[in-house]
């Protein structure tokens, strides 16, 4: 508990005017808001997330003075966790047996993605074995960067590849879902009650779920504690029938805006040349991943009670929060989508290290003749 309080105090200190780039963050929010508004006017899917993401990525590419410091993410991540937990309903336990075929398909899907993407980055990216392995694994960004750096990989390349993957998947998947499922994602009014009409007790209940979830996750040493902890507590409260409150649509829009801004600003501080190269490489890997996603979704749909569209969202190689927000916008079973992404990240997290040791062993990345292409180019770039 002391560590949690220390982290909270450190977070408050980082908000001091001398340490927090308020002007650059305000510009990022302004540009993100303009992007979201433009996407709303164009009736495009998930406008506040995609619009802010596209504009902030362009701003980073143009080297505009934008920034989204990491300290702003935990509070919004907590909100998203509570929001996702609210999608778990009391009847969810009865549906768990129906998830067995889809979870089995998920394991095979992950293996296929890892083999295809690691090989792709080795052959076309010229990455050293360590960097290619952790850039190609379909796991969470933070986990893959942390373990990859420990094993001797280029942490910045791994981070940029996973950031670009999430960027490209989130930008393209809503349109794919709209095209395949005929589901209208854009132009509709946001669902959920307004914050002005939501009872104060309901809002306090959701806030309590978030705070209690952070404490629980810290105590249990859960990964992604600001997301998973609040989601677990909120899910328990909603599954037990103690609350049926859902977040106001203004909070949902704000979550989309902040997510889009933070994803776009991940490329700040990296040269345009490296950004374009990473985006080009990630475009190829994203095509591979989405092709595998569609293929496995349609195959598994034949042996399960779930249709292709929810399976596409459950298997898609995007982030947990981003894919769950898309499911929320589609009025689909958020619990189904979120659970599959949690299991995917968990399985990759516990298996990546041992699998790396089994396949690559103690081989040094510097011994590979292709190292100069990927790691060498990144070494001279400015740090993010």
Where are these regions (language model features)?
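Intrinsically disordered, low-complexity non-transmembrane regions of multi-pass membrane transporters
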Residues: 1-30, 154-157, 182-200, 358-384
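Structural signature of multi-pass alpha-helical membrane transport proteins
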Residues: 3-72, 76-92, 197-271, 291-298, ...
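Cytoplasmic-side transmembrane-helix entry/capping segments in multi-pass membrane proteins
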Residues: 69-80, 101-102, 126-137, 159-162, ...
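Membrane-interface helix termini and inter-helical loops of multi-pass transporters
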Residues: 90-98, 179-197, 241-247, 273, ...
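Alpha-helical membrane segments and immediately flanking helix-loop junctions
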Residues: 124-164, 306-340
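Membrane-embedded alpha-helical segments of transport systems
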Residues: 138-144, 158-181, 292, 320-322, ...
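C-terminal transmembrane helix pair
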Residues: 289-384
């Amino acid at each position: 508990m002391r560590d949690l309080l220390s982290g909270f105090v450190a977070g408050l200190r980082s908000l001091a005017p001398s340490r927090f780039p308020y002007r650059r963050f305000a510009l990022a929010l302004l540009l993100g808001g303009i992007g979201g508004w433009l996407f709303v006017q164009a009736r495009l899917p998930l406008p506040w997330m995609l619009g802010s993401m596209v504009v902030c990525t362009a701003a980073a590419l143009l080297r505009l003075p934008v920034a989204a410091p990491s300290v702003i993410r935990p509070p919004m991540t907590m909100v998203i966790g509570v929001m996702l937990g609210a999608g778990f309903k009391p009847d969810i336990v009865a549906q768990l047996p129906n998830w067995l075929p889809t979870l089995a398909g998920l394991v095979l899907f992950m293996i296929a993605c890892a083999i295809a993407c690691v090989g792709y980055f080795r052959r076309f990216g010229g990455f050293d074995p360590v960097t290619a392995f952790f850039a190609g694994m379909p796991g969470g960004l933070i986990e893959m960067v942390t373990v990859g750096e420990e094993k001797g990989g280029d942490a910045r390349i791994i981070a940029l590849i996973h950031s670009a993957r999430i960027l490209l998947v989130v930008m393209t998947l809503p349109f794919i879902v709209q095209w395949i499922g005929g589901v209208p994602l854009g132009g509709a009014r946001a669902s959920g009650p307004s914050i002005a009409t939501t009872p104060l007790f309901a809002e306090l209940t959701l806030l309590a779920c978030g705070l209690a979830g952070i404490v629980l996750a810290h105590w249990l040493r859960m990964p992604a504690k600001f997301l998973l902890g609040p989601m677990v507590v909120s899910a328990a409260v909603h599954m037990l029938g103690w609350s049926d409150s859902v977040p106001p649509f203004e909070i949902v829009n704000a979550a989309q805006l902040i997510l889009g801004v933070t994803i776009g600003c991940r490329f700040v501080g990296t040269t345009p040349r490296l950004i374009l190269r990473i985006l080009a490489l990630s475009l190829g890997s994203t095509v591979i991943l989405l092709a595998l996603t569609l293929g496995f979704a349609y195959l598994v749909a034949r042996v399960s009670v779930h249709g292709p569209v929810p399976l596409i969202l459950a298997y898609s190689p995007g982030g947990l929060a981003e894919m769950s927000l898309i499911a929320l916008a589609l009025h689909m079973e958020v619990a189904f989508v979120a659970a599959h992404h949690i299991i995917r990240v968990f399985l990759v997290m516990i298996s990546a290290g041992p699998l790396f040791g089994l396949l690559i062993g103690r081989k040094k990345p510097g011994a590979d003749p292709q190292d100069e292409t990927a790691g060498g180019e990144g070494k001279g770039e400015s740090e993010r």
